[in-house]
A protein has these predicted regions:
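Short basic helix-loop element that most often maps to the first helix and adjoining turn
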Residues: 5-24, 49
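Conserved hydrophobic/aromatic packing and binding residues within compact polymer-binding modules
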Residues: 7, 21-22, 32-35, 61
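DNA major-groove recognition helix of helix-turn-helix
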Residues: 25, 36, 54, 65
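DNA major-groove recognition helix of helix-turn-helix/homeodomain DNA-binding modules
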Residues: 26, 45-60
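Recognition helix of helix-turn-helix/homeodomain-like DNA-binding domains
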Residues: 26-41
Length: 74
């Protein structure tokens, strides 16, 4: 699964709107929609924010793993 498909899947699992996630990332809703559609690449720092927020690993978000490993606590 591609990362853009994964971030949409996770957002929907959490019953969040694109606007809420866009606010979390400090971007506009249209920009976030472009991330989900694959039209625009999402910055790595935004992927880190999402991984922490959803408590999943970057491997899961990027599709390198299908296991929802928790983001390591520090």
């Amino acid at each position: 699964m591609k990362y853009n498909e994964r971030i949409r899947e996770i957002r929907e699992d959490y019953s969040m709107t694109q606007q809420k996630v866009a606010n979390l990332l400090n971007v506009g809703q249209r920009t976030y929609a472009d991330y989900e559609s694959g039209k625009t690449r999402i910055p790595v720092d935004s992927l880190l924010i999402l991984a922490k927020y959803y408590n999943v690993s970057l491997d899961y978000i990027t599709g390198a793993s299908n296991v929802k490993t928790e983001y390591p606590c520090r």
